[in-house]
Structure formats: structure tokens, C-alpha cells
Amino acid sequence: HIGANTDVPAGDIGVGGREIGFMFGQYKRLRNEFTGTLTGKGLDWGGSPLRPEATGYGTCYFAQEMLATRGESFKGKTVAISGSGNVAQYACEKATQLGAKVVTLSDSSGYVYDPEGIDADKLAYVMELKNIFRGRIREYAEKYPQATYYEGQRPWSVKCDIAMPCATQNELDGDEAQTLIANGCICVAEGANMPSTPEAIKA
């Protein structure tokens, strides 16, 4: 059911380079071949440089082009990002590099709001927390007291210029889209797969 010319599985929520590596190892063992059958492998197993960064960075570059149509850029903008996995981490990194201030990250339990911004050092902590220790985003607020954790909520009520849903499908609904618009959001850049509901798109 899988193969370079059939179906090429990729990582997703809870499935990163480690898990893809496990599956690729078994594929090699069963098929006795080393082909491009799974994407998201580590570099030691034939993975591509910048593969982990590609989606998050690409979301920012796409947003940059959208902003340019209005004569705007990331510089000085406030960004709300959902998620705290691969896509969200690198979207946060690139948005910060482009001059924005990222103020939210989330997971399935809730979101953190850091009015001072999630800079490179704080993001390094998030990457260690999520990628190595498999922790929860609420631990960010325990480490950085200026941040607030909102249990069971999504970050779309936070005032921002740019919203980047980078968590999961249907995470931004029509009411939340209207809230973003009312709060002055000028750009929504989707990093996740189908994160906006049809009602949100129409808003």
C-alpha cells in the first residue's frame, strides 16, 4: 500500500522523524530496498536538509507575499500561532527572524500567551520541551512567569496582526475568524492542513 509511486506517508501530530525512522527501517527490512517511500526521515536515513523547517518557513514566506500586496511586512507585527509542534515551532522561528513578535503557542490542552514575545531563547525551550521531553505547553507559563496559560482554549481571541493556525484541521471556526477581524487581524496564514472551517473562510 505504500511506495515511491504508490503512496508516500509523512509525519503529522505525534509522528516525527523518530517514528518515520522506525517505519522506514521496517520498510527496508521487509522490502530489502532503500527508496523514497516515507518523507520526514532523519538525515542519517536519507532525509532532506530543511525538511523539518519547510512547512513553518513556507507558511511565513507565503504570509510575507500576502502582506506585500498591502505594502506590509512582518516587521513590527504581533503574531498569534496555534500549535507547538514542528510547523508551529519553525513558523515561530521564521516570523521572529522577519521582525514580528509571536505571542502565542498552543497544544491540545490550551494555549500560552506571552505579551513579551516568544524569542529565540524561549523557542529553544519549547523545542526541548516538546521534541525531547514530550511535555505540555502549560509548562512554558511555569518557566516564564510573564506568560499566562489558558486551559482548554484556542488563541484566536488574542489581539494580533497575523494569525497562523499551525495545529490541526478545523481549529479556526467562523466565530473565531470574526473575533480576529474585530481585533484588527489583517492576515491568516494556514500552516496546518485545512485549519479553517468553511464558515471561517467565508468570514
Regions found by a protein language model. Give the residues of each.
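Conserved helix-loop functional segments at active or binding sites
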Residues: 29, 64-69, 149, 169, ...
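N-terminal ligand-binding/catalytic initiation module
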Residues: 1-49
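Short glycine/threonine-rich loop-to-helix capping motif typified by GTGT followed
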Residues: 18-22, 86-95, 177-178, 202
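Glycine-rich phosphate/diphosphate-binding loop of Rossmann-like nucleotide-binding domains
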Residues: 39-42, 47-53, 57-154
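Rossmann-fold NAD(P)-binding glycine/threonine-rich loop
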Residues: 167-203
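A glycine- and small/hydrophobic-rich beta-loop-beta segment
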Residues: 143, 147-151, 156-160, 174-180
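Short, surface-exposed connector motifs at secondary-structure boundaries
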Residues: 3-5, 72-76, 158-161, 179-187
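Short catalytic-loop micro-motif centered on adjacent basic/acidic residues
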Residues: 9, 80-81, 162-165, 187-190
